[in-house]
Amino acid sequence: MNSGPLQQVTFRSFATADRDPLLKLWRACDLTRPWNDPEDDIRQCLANSSSALLIAEQDRRLCGSVMMGCDGHRGWVYYLAVDPDCRHQGVGRALMAQAESWMRERNVPKIQAMI
C-alpha cells in the first residue's frame, strides 16, 4: 500500500480504449453488481450531455475514475474508484474536487453520492 502526497495525476475524459482497464478497476474496487451492467452505465453516460466520466492517470496508467450526472438542480456521483495501489495519495479527493468543479460549472447546487 502506498501512502504519501498525491503524485503526478492527470485527469481527462473517458476514451474508448479505457473500457477494459476501467471495468477491471471497478471490479477491483467492488463497484460492480450482477444486476447492474457497468458497460450500459458507460454507454448511457457517454450518450447524455448532462453526464461525464473522468479518468485519473498516474504514469499513463488508469488509477481512478468518477462518473457524474445532473438534472439541473441536483448532481450525482457514481463509480468513484481509486486503484488499490494508488490509495492514500489524495487521488479520490482530487477526483471529488473534479466532480465538484464540473457541478459548479453547471450551476448544480446539490451533490449526492451513489454508494
Residues covered by each model-derived region:
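A short helix-loop-beta-strand connector motif used in the catalytic cores of GNAT acetyltransferases and
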Residues: 43-55, 76
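Conserved beta-strand-loop-alpha-helix junction that forms the acyl-donor binding cleft
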Residues: 84-87, 113-115
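Conserved GNAT acetyl-CoA-binding A-motif
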Residues: 103-115
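A short, aromatic/hydrophobic, helix- or strand-capping loop or linear motif
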Residues: 33-42
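Conserved acetyl-CoA-binding loop-helix of GNAT-fold acetyltransferases
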Residues: 88-101
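A short beta-loop-alpha structural element at the N-terminal edge
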Residues: 8-22
